Amino acid sequence: MAGATDQRRQEVLRAIVADYIASQEPVGSKALLERHNLKVSSATIRNDMAVLESEGYIVQQHASSGRIPTEKAYRTFVDSINDIKPLSVAERRAILGFLERGVDLEDVLKRSVQLLSQLTRQAAVIQLPNLNVSRVKHCEVVLLSPVRLLLVLITDNGRVEQRNVEVDQICEPEHVAKMRDVLNRALDNKTLSDASASLAELAAGEILVDPDIQPMILRCATVLIETLVEQPNDRLILAGASNLTHIAREMPSSLPAMLEALEEQVVVLKLLTNVRDLGHVSVLIGEENEDEQLRGTSVVTTGYGAQGATLGGLGVVGPTFMDYSGTMSKVYAVAHYVSRVLSGG
């Protein structure tokens, strides 16, 4: 759209979208004049609305009702959002404080989706880090009893895995110290795939170790390999699906498919896996979603990470009439502070 007339129609369209998002009620020309400083006559507004309707931006459900935006209108509205509005200092401080109370990586991520679902009143999702990009930070060996050990594997992005190991000989404290040293020399700062290869060498006896601890090292290496191999590359944490029940009246046909997609996870995981950039918020509206189950929804996503590397995606799934500006701001803010906490800042 170009020129003064087209610019005015853009303003009318933005006003219609904003009013419908706020009320979920059809918008008429009289209401637009009352709520917005459009500085034109009611007849001009009606003419603009007729043009917008002919161009596919708005529709009239009933002859006597106002207009509602189409997905084309929502896309134009989202594309007109030039800057993501920052949250208030109090909101940012509250987000950071809540996330910093997380005891480990998974707790931080659970807190992030709980918070995001509360802030946006939508369903919030986050992808746990792909372990293929993780590195082993430390392996701790704890003596629980003379024949039972606890192995604690810690990755550089804060992931913690714990496994109990039963051994076939009496384990002394000095054995524990030796095993800790052997395992950390084999694992330290290795990617998880390389760590698995090192553990396989230990299990096969290709790396020389003290004969006193070799059987126990074999058992520990086997358990750690199983731990690394069994971890799925992609897992999803979901919160706030119940928030979507409020849209049942406006979108009765979309809600079941939306809830099914969230429950199955595969569809949403595919979306989050494609998130690559930190700091960029992406919005998919209705038919822009490749998967049929999400074509009645809008999905707002971004990446989170540590030390500048993307670890996964997070976002919200909601109705096409969501508050796009507010949702984009909140998704961006939560991702920013998740990244900050994971980076140790």
From Swiss-Prot:
GO BP of this protein: negative regulation of DNA-templated transcription
Pfam families, alphabetized: HrcA (PF01628)
Keywords: Repressor, Stress response, Transcription, Transcription regulation
UniProt keyword Repressor, yes or no: yes
Protein origin, superkingdom: Bacteria
Gene Ontology MF, one: DNA binding
Protein task: Negative regulator of class I heat shock genes (grpE-dnaK-dnaJ and groELS operons). Prevents heat-shock induction of these operons.
Xref: NCBIfam families: hrcA (TIGR00331)
Family under the similarity heading: Belongs to the HrcA family.
The protein's name: Heat-inducible transcription repressor HrcA
